[in-house]
Amino acid sequence: MIGLNTAAIYILQTLGSLYLLIVLLRFILQLVRADFYNPLSQFIVRATKPLLNPLRRIIPGFGGIDLASLVLAILIQLVLMILILMLMGYGVGGFIMQLLIWSIIAVTSLFLKVFFFALIISVILSWVAPGSYNPGAQLVNQICEPLLMPFRKLLPNLGGLDLSPIFAFLALKLIDMLVINNLAAMTGMPQQLSIFL
């Protein structure tokens, strides 16, 4: 029985986190004004449409921000946490507000991770395939550009040497360590849910 629960938790976490990532990417792509005609963007739009369209009737966008996809990401994270805790044998009845707070923290952590790994991919592509125009590379660059732009404005021109990714990495890591981890600790997030950070 324990083995079955462990397997169920693994499958639920893997599939749930994958769909959560797709939903959060939908939010990020609209946030950074990415090309929605990109084949990967179109896949993300189609994958999220069944759940997002009904939610959009209740939650409209605001200032160019796709609030419906952000709310959907938080709700998916909340359901994932509830189901995983229940499979572990914990009651969740009196902890819904805490679980909601932990869900927001976890989604924020994933948000930072998307930019972190997009930066890694962007740096690698700039070394091995500079000027590549495949859909994946184009989308990664569009995600990274708004993050790198403020650092490029602050840093001096070093004759083609772009140090902005290094400072962006440091900023993301500091936010993760000083804000996300501390918020999780301050709100008493249990060890069982740290898999989402």
Swiss-Prot record:
Protein location: Cell membrane
Top-level taxon in the UniProt lineage: Bacteria
Gene Ontology CC entries for this record: plasma membrane
Main location: membrane
A Pfam family reported for this protein in Swiss-Prot or TrEMBL: YGGT
Positions of transmembrane segments: 9-29, 67-87, 104-124, 160-180
UniProt xrefs under InterPro entries: CCB3/YggT (IPR003425)
Entry membrane topology: Multi-pass membrane protein
Keywords from the UniProt entry: Cell membrane, Membrane, Transmembrane, Transmembrane helix
Family, similarity comment: Belongs to the YggT family.
PANTHER family: PROTEIN COFACTOR ASSEMBLY OF COMPLEX C SUBUNIT B CCB3, CHLOROPLASTIC-RELATED, YLMG HOMOLOG PROTEIN 2, CHLOROPLASTIC
Full protein name: Uncharacterized protein PA0392
